[in-house]
Amino acid sequence: MKKIAVLTSGGDAPGMNAAIRAVVRTAIYNGIEVYGVYQGYLGLINDDLKKLELGSVGDTIQRGGTFLYSARCPEFKDKEVRAKAIENLRSRGIDGLVVIGGDGSYRGAQRISEECPEIQTIGIPGTIDNDIPGTDYTIGFDSALNTIIESVDKIRDTASSHARTFIVEVMGRDCGDLALWAGLAVGAETIIVPEEKVDIKDVAEKIESGIKRGKKHSIVVVAEGVMGGQLCADELAKYIHVDARVSVLGHIQRGGSPTGQDRVLASRLGGHAVELLMDGKTALGVGIKQNQLTQTKFEDIFNNKGSKFDKQMYKLAQELSI
């Protein structure tokens, strides 16, 4: 292994810069040249690569986002387009590629490993949704979780002051981990996630029951993949008359300085990715389980989507929100 490239793809997540830093410094420490690919897979297609030195990643571990930029690249699904990207890697003598991102990013890496076996590929899970099998946590999840908690704590102050019900919409298209963990942490009265079917009438009855017990306000946390916050409020209004407001947290969840946990996680996974490349491994996603570094085949990751949801935690949240 003499030259590797690293890119970030898909939605940005706090801690991506820390992962890039770990990849670059681990590689250089072991005598490997590193090239940064700008704007994800689009950069591979356009040959937008730049050699990275130790100084290139100085003062980045605490920064949110990704200094390599990120972009969604649907055209990478085209085999002819991928062939151009692969040729760009070959022409530079790059024999290893580290991809930081989510499910779609991993699929692009798998295609490269299939169509050009001499270029090894390793995926690092970077997404706030925490929806990648093969790891307990993805880079950015803890940071986004803490952003949500801080925001909802402030929203609850207002909800309490005005005796209102607040519907808080958080990210999570197919995975409800952000909603579940945040809802449990802020003491939400109701948590609505894609993995568990919820009848809005039951939610309304629960809120009404609380009001009868003297409860003045409620917090409902809903994952965007189930329904929008406004739709949730409109549906509730069919069953109960409460002063309900909607707060869509949106892209604030992706921004900000990564937490200590995300910085450490990103550093460990970034270093491990380089070690796997040096060992001749390919088509693997790195992760962490029970605080131990792991690696999982891309195909196993794709075949186990939706397997991570913690039903016991959901049950606990239901019991604590009576």
UniProtKB/Swiss-Prot annotation:
Segments forming a coiled coil: none
Activity modulation notes: Allosterically activated by ADP and other diphosphonucleosides, and allosterically inhibited by phosphoenolpyruvate.
UniProt keyword Acetylation, yes or no: no
Keyword Transmembrane helix part of the UniProt annotation: no
Gene Ontology MF annotations: 6-phosphofructokinase activity; AMP binding; ATP binding; fructose-6-phosphate binding; identical protein binding; metal ion binding; monosaccharide binding
Binding site for ATP: G11, R72, C73, G102, D103, G104, S105
Location within or outside the cell: Cytoplasm
Predominant place of localization: cytoplasm
Record field: catalytic activity: beta-D-fructose 6-phosphate + ATP = beta-D-fructose 1,6-bisphosphate + ADP + H(+)
Pathway named in the protein's UniProt entry: Carbohydrate degradation; glycolysis; D-glyceraldehyde 3-phosphate and glycerone phosphate from D-glucose: step 3/4
PROSITE patterns in the record: PHOSPHOFRUCTOKINASE
EC class: transferase
Binding site for substrate: T127, I128, D129, R164, M171, G172, R173, E224, R245, H251, I252, Q253, R254
InterPro entries tied to this protein: ATP_PFK, ATP_PFK_prok-type, PFKA_ATP_prok, Phosphofructokinase_CS, Phosphofructokinase_dom, PKF_sf
Binding site for ADP: R21, A22, V23, V24, R25, R156, G187, A188, E189, R213, K215, K216, H217
Keywords attached to this entry: Allosteric enzyme, ATP-binding, Cytoplasm, Glycolysis, Kinase, Magnesium, Metal-binding, Nucleotide-binding, Transferase
UniProt-annotated binding residues for Mg(2+): D103
Active site: residue positions: D129 (proton acceptor)
Cofactor(s) annotated in UniProt: Mg(2+)
Pfam families from the UniProt entry: PFK (PF00365)
EC number: 2.7.1.11
Quaternary assembly: Homotetramer.
Record-stated family: Belongs to the phosphofructokinase type A (PFKA) family. ATP-dependent PFK group I subfamily. Prokaryotic clade 'B1' sub-subfamily.
NCBIfam families: PFKA_ATP, PRK03202.1
Protein name (Swiss-Prot/TrEMBL): ATP-dependent 6-phosphofructokinase
Organism: Staphylococcus carnosus (strain TM300)
Gene: pfkA
